[in-house]
Amino acid sequence: MPLFIAFAFLFIIPSTAVLISNNSDFGTTNFVYSQPDHMNSNVTNSLNIQNIPVKKVHVGDIDIAYKTFGKGDPILLVSGSSSDMNAWEPSTLRNLSSNHTVIIFDNRGVGNTTAGTKSFSIQQLANDTAGLLDALKIQKADVLGYSLGSFVAQQITVTHPEKVNRLILLGASCGGKEGVPESPQLVKFFSEMVNKSINNIPITPQEVKMLLSIPMGSAWMELHPNFLEAIPEAKDLFAGIPSNTIKQQNDISQNWMATNWSGICDELTKISNPTLIITGTHDNNVPTANS
């Protein structure tokens, strides 16, 4: 998805979600249809993700910006296309941090991470991410990837299997040209919204609603008309993205898409890690069939 602001609400699954597991570590049921529950409000409510200092570490030809917080086994979160680490939904991060050491970071060329000199590719992003784990002296972590981050997470698991404990894929595809393509109308709409953002043209309330209905699904939006007010921190993030950041991230996003990742569909049998796949039945941006 080439528009950063459409990702201000990551990890909110549309009204009905399909959870697919390949290993009993995640439960014995292969297909689970679930309604989203309210977050546990008692878990680490005092943790303010925005106040956690950003650190930097040199990996290869780039300086990667990252944050770590929480206690427990490490879990590494890989963001979607054109999203920086601030796009993750805050209450989800707080809940994860109750029993995990959470690592969030900016991908190459996004947010506070430098672009470096190497060409952009899914394999390069996977190498960057594996290098981050090495730099942080983390031998193995659970890896969660969202959207484009799911490509990176799969690639890491294939090329650096020793670094991945459990794999969680959200809004995922194994890439290539055999999947269900994104609607041309959606691509056109995203492009129009990006151009508005870059040129400081206000996005109308109706356009905001449409932006959110794409990953959420219109049925979910109708059932939760006031959901934005329920996550004020995400609302603040949504309202505070500078236009130059949006332009930078859109340029990077277009560069990623131009790499035309061939995917790992033919290599999925190499993944023996416990894997959980989460997909929304009403997600218009990442068709359920691709997951």
How would you describe each model-predicted region?
Residues S81, T281-D283:
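Acidic beta-to-alpha connecting loop that harbors the catalytic carboxylate
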Residues I104, G109-L144:
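Active-site loop/oxyanion-hole signature of alpha/beta-hydrolase fold enzymes
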Residues Q139-P181:
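Conserved hydrolase catalytic core segment
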Residues L167-P202:
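Flexible "cap/lid" loop of the alpha/beta hydrolase fold
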Residues P205-D251, M257-S262, E267:
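Conserved alpha/beta-hydrolase catalytic His-Asp/Glu region
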Residues I271, I277-T279:
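Short beta-strand/loop motif that positions the catalytic acidic residue
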Residues N284-N290:
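Conserved alpha/beta-hydrolase "acid-adjacent" motif
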